[in-house]
């Protein structure tokens, strides 16, 4: 799957949880990615973040960073 598609999908998840406030949204986004994304998709978005994370919203960047921690 292309990085652009993954960014779009991850940001959509981020928008869904945005109303919770960033402190609550970040772990919810990360949990969603772990539960519902294929491991290859998670790896690709982690690599995308390592390459600069272009296009990822701030809360999504933090959530993805927590996956690789």
Regions found by a protein language model. Give the residues of each.
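Residue-level detector of well-ordered alpha-helical segments, enriched
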Residues: 5, 9, 25-29, 41, ...
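N-terminal acidic leader/helix
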Residues: 1-22
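Residue-level recognition of alpha-helical structural elements
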Residues: 2, 22-26, 52, 56
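Short, charged early-sequence alpha-helical segments and their helix-coil boundaries
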Residues: 41-66
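N-terminal glycine-rich anion-binding loops that anchor highly charged ligand groups
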Residues: 36-39
């Amino acid at each position: 799957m292309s990085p652009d598609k993954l960014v779009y999908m991850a940001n959509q998840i981020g928008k869904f949880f945005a109303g919770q406030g960033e402190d609550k949204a970040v772990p919810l986004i990360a949990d969603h990615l772990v539960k519902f994304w294929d491991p290859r998709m998670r790896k690709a978005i982690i690599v995308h973040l390592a390459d600069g994370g272009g296009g990822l919203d701030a809360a999504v960047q933090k959530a993805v960073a927590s996956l690789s921690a």
